[in-house]
Amino acid sequence: MMQVSQGTIGSPWHQAYHSSSSTSDLSGYNHEFLRRSPDQYSSRGSMESLDQASAAYHHHLPPAKSTNCIDQLVHLHNKRDSAYSSFSTNASIPEYRSSPFSKERSYSMESMHSRNSSGQEGIKHADIKYIKTVYDVQRGISEEYEVNSSSVKNRNYSRQPAYNRHSIGPHGRLEQSRFFSESGGFERAAPMPPTRSDSYALTRHHERPNSWSSLDQNRNFRTPKAAGLHSTNTSSNAAQQPKHVHGDGHLHPVLERSPESSPLIKPKQVYSETPQPGQPMLPTGIYPVPAPEPHFAHAPQPPKNNNGRLYPALAKEGSYGAKSSEKVLPFSEPNKNEKDTQNLRSKSVGQYPMNHSVKEREKKQEGPTGFAHYKLHFTAGPDISTSSLTNDRNDQQPLRLDNIDINEQQKNGTKVAEEFSVYAHPAFQNEWSDSKTKQDIASSDIIGLHRNSLSSDAHGEHEYHNHFNIASSSHNKMDERSNRQADHRKKLESLSFTVHADEADGPSSNPLKPDESPSPSQKKSYDFTRRRLSSSSSQSSKTDGNKLSSVFDKVCKIEQREHENHRSQFLCGNINQSGLSTRGQNNKGSFTMVEEIRNKFISQDQTPNPNEWRRLSSSHSNEKVTGMHQLTRQGIVYGLQTGDAQKQMPEKQAEKMHSYNQEQNILQAVPDDDNRSFNSQTMPNKEDDWQCAAQDTLGFNRAYRNSVKDAQCKVLEATSYRRKDLEISPPHYKKPEKNVRPASAPFRKKSSSLSPHAPKERHSVTPTDNCASIQESQGVFFPSRIGAKRRITAEQKKRSYSEPEKMNEVGASESESAPLTVSKMEPVASFSENSVADRRRIFEREGKACSTINLSKPQLKQLQQNALADYIERKTGRRPSSQETRLLKERSQSTYFSGSIMDNQSMTSTSSMNSLNEHNLSYRHREPLSKTGRVSSTLPPGLTGFFDLSSFENNPEYPENRSRSSSFAHQLRSERLLDHRSKVEFGKGRETNKPKEVSLQSDDDVIITSSRRHGKSASAEDLLDRLPQPPALHVRSRSSPASDMKSREYMSRQEVGNKTSYASASNKEIRSIKSNHFEQMSFTPSFKNHIDTGEDPVPENSSTIQRSAQLENQRNTKTQSISGIYSPHPETKQEPLALPIHSVPAKVTQTSLAHATFDYITAEEYLYSGKRGKESASPTDNKEISDQEWCLPENSSSEDLNDPERFAKYTSAQRPQSFETKSGNSINETVQQNKSSGPTAGPKFSTSWKSNGMWSSGSSEAETTFNHGKISLHISESCLQPQSPMTGQEDEGDDEVFVKEQDTESFSGTFVPPSPPPFPPPSLEDALLKQRIEKFPLVPNTLDEIWENTEEASTQVKVKSNERYLQCASEYTASTESSGSYLLNSGITKRDTDGPLLRLSSIVPAPEPLASPVDPTKPIEEQETQPHGADTSILQSSEGNFNPSDSQSTLPHVRSELMSSEDAKSQELAKEIVTKDKSLANILDPDSRMKTTMDLMEGLFTKSSSALKEKNQKRKAKKQIDNIIAPESEXKEEKRETLDNASNYSAYYSTSAPKAELLRKMKTIHSQIGGKEEQFDVNEKKAELISSLTCKLEVLKDAKESLIDDIKLNNSLGEEVETQIETLCKPNEFDKYKMFIGDLDKVVNLLLSLSGRLARVENALSSLGEDASAEERKTWNEKKKQLCGQHEDARELKENLDRREKLVMDFLGNYLTGEEFAHYQHFVKMKSALLIEQRELDDKIKLGQEQLRCLTESLPSDYLISMKVSLPEERRSSLGNKSLPPPLTSSL
């Protein structure tokens, strides 16, 4: 802002004000005396100081935009060299050591003056031509003014009259600076560019306004060097100083001390330090500088008695300067009025008239040129004691004369004395000490006086003079000042200095006793200095110098008051420190908006009498009179009202907060009641004078600031500095704060807001300064930031780098800013966590001990991610996987990091005032979040919203608020899937607690998403987007992967997990079942989902249906939750499905749901469903309940479901057709339910996971388990989405933090999972099973539960004796097809449970036990043997699982009933035979672990890790179930374990390879059998087993026939679908469809063939004995390797097919209606499922045949002949007993 001619600046600039010295080169200055170095002021009064303490500045002069703007922008110590640096330093901020509000206001106005006056060693100005850049707060621009070194000389405290320095009062700093630069006529040259030393001095002066102790100032004012040189000038200066005090007072808030702003006349204060070369103003005083080159007002390091004194080293010191200060001093007093002060600023800055009026006018004219608006950091006025001020006041004319003389003397070196005497004026000194730095009170006073004089000139210099003389009486001064304050206030509103005039007036009016602690005034000076900073102080200094005559009178008064105040301050310097903080508290009590404070200050400036103010300050009440001094940033008005100070006790507190913020900016001498009190007490006139100077300076500064504002506005615009943040401080900041620098705490936010580009350290500086002000006011702490440079910790620096956007907040001391912010801004809680430190604390509160500050950006992200994970873990009880967290983190980082509300709120992290404002705005929005889940801004917006879903949902824009950079709302939309899933699932977890609220919210978002995804609206793109994993479609390929993809919302995700295989889907399903089971268990309605979707749900056993339905519901619910389909309302639990339904083709949804239910009954699922079954009173009740519940969402209707016949038409064609026959009621219920939920989620969900399950042949078992019906139906159903959705969910679950557990919670409590697809129409086998059930009454629910558990296990292998054989055959086929034996068992049993599930396809007499399906692992022989025994028991256990009565009863019970003696006997026979005839062990051993085609097929579909996990879990669960179901038969349990993946174990493969060897072994064993009886018994057992196996084979054959019928029906359905598609779709799309269907057959057959071959090879290898030759083993291994490679290729083909299925489903969804789409899905899924089932049945039949052959061969020929007769009877009995179990096909 201020450019310093390098040639002229020379070393003094760099030495004294080197940018580094500003911050660090304070060593050159006694830190005690460095009240505020221009650097500090540059940071405070300068752009930076304005940025930091914009409140201190006029709002026009944003603190960040003052001299320190460069510092903020550049963050360089050499910023002083830049325009900003010169501005800040030249802003009349002498570099003087600022003690943190210490008692010694080393740079109090007095001390400054005394230093200057005493030494002229004070600030020595090198012949440097300084271009003073003054930032006009009001104008918001910085203007560059060349400060004449002569002015600086004038401002030299020893050489120059204080008035010159004072003419550059803090208030006039800006305008004075302009005037100084403008008033080139003034002897002052442009002050040297302030170095960071200046800022440091300023900062420290801000921090240590006490250095400007009133005593020091009084002493300085009273005993300026000018006193010796020219007592008149001294008195004049004293008088001027008071006026300058006013002008400076105004400047003091902006106390940017430079020779211009600092008093031209050194006070008598002796500066310990001589200005270093580079430091225009040495701490010891103003050092002479060539007139053309103003020097920075370096506050000499005076004794602590020179506390508040600022020395304008750079202030143009010339005779005119001195004269000006003389004039300005009088005007400064009149300029106590804001207008006058402003005028004085503009005028006095510009004018250092030889005559008071002339000088005033000259100052007005010179202001910018003549005066560098630098307030002396130390006032020359300390020497000019109150008496001198009084004398000055009394001698306004003499003062003017003195000023003239002083100007001459300044030329002669005596001007400094005058000026200093003016500054020596206690009031002026107090003003400076009030002005935080109280740059030479002479400077500030003179500046203020000049400003006042300028104001008086503008408003009547003579009036000021007269009034100043009149102002000898503080009342007159107060009156005039009040008037002028009104003007000054107006100006202050425009100007950055509002309070100073009042302060100056205050002290003038209230000459406080010198004993009164200077700390209030010092604090004020400190605040003011902060606020005034460089530009203001320089401006005020010149202004004061200009308006010396009127200021003289005022200075006299001010001197008296100031002298008294100075004494009181001197005595109370420490008190002032504490008092300063007190005053800050009092003044800042109402510190709300800088504007308000400024306005209040203006009013106070206008209204309060200096005496009143002084009384307050003299009383040094904590209610500092500066209640008025609340500085509004725009106006940065220092309210000097006494009444305001009193009434602002609360305001003072807020004002303190604000003051600290403003102190940084303003050096709030006036706002700080403590400073004021201190000044007014010790130097009563000092504050008044300072205020007068501030007023004068304000007047001058107004013009100057206008120019500066123009420049600064440009700078601000360039820096994107926002001044609105200056106005941000809410009025509620009234709560009394410790002298927390108002500017800092509010400016934390404000600063950040003020200057987005301002470094954090700037903002931090302000907070730091606030802290410093507080601390300094307490006299204890030094600012974390010295000068413009902020002391930032390594952590803060790290954070600044980690969050470069918040570099402006880098320096912010989290402790300072946060505490200050919190304490001050508690009303605005937004600052509680504005800073990164706050966020870090948040994370720590989240259990993140590590500090974000210390973290690198990646570490911070990790920390946030961890916090998110912790939060999720807390909320959901499950810690999300790293991937999930990663997704969340990525999602959240985009939102959270860029724009999290917390970040926005974080002051340190806030990049700009806008950020802060947004924080504030968003804070209100964020508050709910903070309250609800302030967990961590690291949490992704969605999660954050989840933390407070209601808040988030209620505030859809909240995420945006939360993260302005990336609104979560948009991100939520873009990441709708992830967020929704997280949200939904999280909501689910929460939903248990508040289901509807979260659900609705989630559902709204989710449903929208899901409906869009779920329905046709959910395009393939959605699926692709949502489901980047096409493999999820593996299941689709099984039955209707397209449907799965159709319900891509759920299924695609889930299918991704399930894509590889149905088994994977089953596994996922199991996994999901686990979670879902709990969910569904929590709400039995899950079963309804099954019914809802259940095309054929009712007839099945209610428990079975319930199981499957619940499992399906769980899956569906997961799916729904994922897609947001789940209804927020428990009643509408399935409604979420309904919601997507409209998006999804209704038929698809219905069909999918209908099939989905059966698809997902795995062991775990079954167990969970069993648990849910337990919940239900009875299977029937459960079914009814679930039906009802599922029916609840009838709104989601599906044409298919609505038209049961129509649907049954397809289903019957699909073998579920029996669904109609199954039960009209069940169909109707199912239809209704499907209408409600089925259409919604069913088709897609069912299809999706169904296709997954069905498609994965291995998982077809699981599906079979899930599908408690015919394999065909189950295949389609199992292939339906329920499984894939679940799988997807589980896959999603990995992504979603809250999904599974929450799903469980939410489902258990709140959500009813979408109704699973209705069970397929009952088959004949179902009818048989039903009959059997009728024969065997239903057992209690407990049995049902056990039965369900057993069913899961039996799903694997267990089937009742004959039923079991049938089921096993059908299961085998079913599992092969899709659901496998699981589907057979669970499906058949379910249908039985639900009622006679009439499966058209399961026409095979149920009585025929399907030994192979149930006990595929068992050799068929054994199974045949077991038909009555083990097989029967297995069948019974599985059927028991399926049949509520039979299997639902505890297996033992069921076995006793359902398991016919034949079943148990067959098992026993098999065991006995194996034990006696080892040759049959491999074939008959129920525990045989031979691999089957279904096993390998299952592997094909369990590619996804989640599916594998589910599979493993399912196996474990099945094992457990098996243990529960058939604990009695270890072989059976082992068999179940073996059959975990596929109950359809084709021992045929194992038998074929080792067949000959086994036979040989059998023969050998037989030959070795000892005892004919034993042999006879074995033979009998074998015969019995053969009979049983024969029956089973018959059942299997019947099942195969039924399966063939199902295949035909499905093919007919496919033809219909194809016809529809051909008519609806484009040719190329139809071709794709045709190719897909054709390839589906090929791929499925290929997989089956390869799986079968591979299974046989593996079995052969496993059967190889140790004696097997290596060559043989090698041959088998090579075959295995070859087959494995081929099988892998086939899997790839399957994956490709799944992707193609996705595409087909996507475009078909656009053409087909819901019903048609459901038919398509059913067709596709059933196609693959039926193929698998057919292959499975073939394998089982082969196995049974081999078992029979082996058994027959093992029997003696004679025995065989005798046995043939009995076989038919056994067969009949077994059939009669086993007719109940539906054929294996029926399970399909």
Swiss-Prot record:
Domain notes: The ASD1 domain mediates F-actin binding. The ASD2 domain mediates the interaction with ROCK1 and is required for apical constriction induction.
Composition skew (Basic and acidic residues), residue ranges: 245-259, 357-366, 476-488, 793-808, 1529-1538
Pfam families assigned to the protein according to its UniProt record, in alphabetical order: ASD1, ASD2
Tissue: Expressed in epithelial cells of the cement gland.
Compositionally biased spans, kind Polar residues: 147-161, 230-240, 893-903, 1055-1067, 1100-1124, 1211-1263, 1433-1451
InterPro entries xrefs: ASD1_dom (IPR014800), ASD2_dom (IPR014799), Shroom_fam (IPR027685)
Signal sequence bounds: none
This protein's UniProt keywords: Actin-binding, Cell junction, Cell membrane, Cell shape, Coiled coil, Cytoplasm, Cytoskeleton, Developmental protein, Membrane, Microtubule
ASD1 domain span: 708-811
UniProt domain ASD2: residue ranges: 1467-1756
Biased composition (Low complexity): 904-915
Coiled-coil segments on the chain, per record: 1653-1708
Listed Pro residues bias regions: 1313-1323
Topology term for the membrane: Peripheral membrane protein
GO BP terms, alphabetized: actin filament organization; apical protein localization; cell morphogenesis; cellular pigment accumulation; pattern specification process; regulation of cell shape
Chain ranges passing through the membrane: none
Biological function: Controls cell shape changes in the neuroepithelium during neural tube closure. Induces apical constriction in epithelial cells by promoting the apical accumulation of F-actin and myosin II, and probably by bundling stress fibers. Induces apicobasal cell elongation by redistributing gamma-tubulin and directing the assembly of robust apicobasal microtubule arrays.
Location within or outside the cell: Cell junction, Adherens junction; Cytoplasm, Cytoskeleton; Apical cell membrane
Gene name as annotated: shroom3
Official protein name in the record: Protein Shroom3
Subunit architecture: Interacts with F-actin. Interacts with ROCK1.
One GO CC term, this protein: adherens junction
Lineage: Eukaryota, Metazoa, Chordata, Craniata, Vertebrata
The family this protein is said to belong to: Belongs to the shroom family.
Region (Disordered): 1-25, 146-174, 225-263, 321-367, 382-401, 469-488, 498-548, 727-768, 793-821, 876-915, 1011-1067, 1086-1133, 1171-1263, 1303-1324, 1404-1467, 1507-1538
